[in-house]
């Protein structure tokens, strides 16, 4: 059986006076109750990449199509690290610029000085501060980054000694931007492409991911994956939610073709 970990805990309110920190715990899509974190090959590959990058103080990229578990796996891995060393560059607005990155790093490190007023002074402060601790800069949704953001982080990484670890996590656009610039591409330590689950992986992982699928006939799992989910963790979460509602609606005590038909019509 594929090993599992406890379900993700609900978010906790921040302590009074604490610096603003995004909740970096892995969140199950749609808040699907009774879900379990499954140690799939994808999750283990992400863990190896993150740990190796952090230990090497390198820059790496984890990329692939949406819904395959890139962010979830990265968040699950960094939960085992000192949260004070994780610097997440998460933005509500799309297409952030270098100014946004500078200011977010300033806030995430909880610096007590006044925020510098010019890029030159700001970069000097960051070059002086980042080497003091083994920080890990996590750039999720990196496909939204402008090219100058990647260049800013590359120059910052180049000029820090010791260097921070930098993880780019995002869609293929992020990977393509990094690869299109020799100065950036030559500095990437690990390139990990995340692919959809194979049929064999689906048959192992899905029954362990949620109790509603335990004991379900393999042919039915294959049907759901072929007709809808296509190896995507996110799509499996959606169909699971609909299956649970379908069982309630139809008064069924197990997942069968009738429940699956009802669920797939809603997906």
Predicted regions and their residues:
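Conserved AAA+ ATPase "SRH/arginine-finger" region at the nucleotide-binding site
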Residues: 91-92, 189-202
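Conserved P-loop NTPase "ATPase switch" module shared by AAA+ and STAND
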Residues: 126-149
């Amino acid at each position: 059986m594929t090993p599992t970990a406890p379900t993700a805990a609900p978010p906790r309110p921040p302590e009074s006076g604490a610096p603003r920190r995004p909740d970096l715990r892995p969140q199950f899509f749609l808040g699907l109750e009774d879900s379990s974190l499954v140690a799939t090959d994808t999750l283990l590959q992400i863990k190896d990449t993150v740990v190796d990058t952090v230990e090497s103080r390198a820059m790496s990229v984890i990329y692939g199509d949406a819904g395959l578990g890139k962010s979830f796996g990265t968040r699950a891995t960094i939960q085992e690290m000192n949260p004070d060393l994780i610097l997440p560059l998460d933005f509500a607005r799309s297409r952030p610029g270098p100014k946004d990155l500078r200011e977010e790093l300033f806030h995430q490190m909880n610096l007590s000085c006044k925020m510098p007023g010019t890029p030159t002074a700001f970069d000097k402060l960051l070059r002086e501060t980042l080497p003091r601790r083994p920080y890990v800069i996590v750039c999720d949704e990196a496909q939204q980054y402008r090219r100058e953001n990647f260049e800013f982080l590359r120059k910052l990484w180049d000029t820090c000694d010791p260097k921070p670890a930098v993880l780019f996590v995002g869609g293929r656009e992020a990977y393509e931007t990094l690869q299109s610039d020799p100065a950036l591409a030559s500095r990437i330590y690990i390139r990990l492409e995340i692919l959809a689950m194979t049929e064999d992986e689906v048959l192992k992982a899905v029954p362990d991911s949620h109790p509603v699928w335990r004991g379900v006939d393999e042919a039915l799992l294959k049907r759901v994956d072929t007709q809808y989910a296509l190896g995507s963790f996110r799509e499996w979460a959606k169909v699971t939610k609909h299956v649970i509602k379908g069982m309630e609606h139809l008064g069924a005590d197990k997942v069968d073709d009738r429940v699956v038909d009802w669920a797939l019509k809603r997906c």
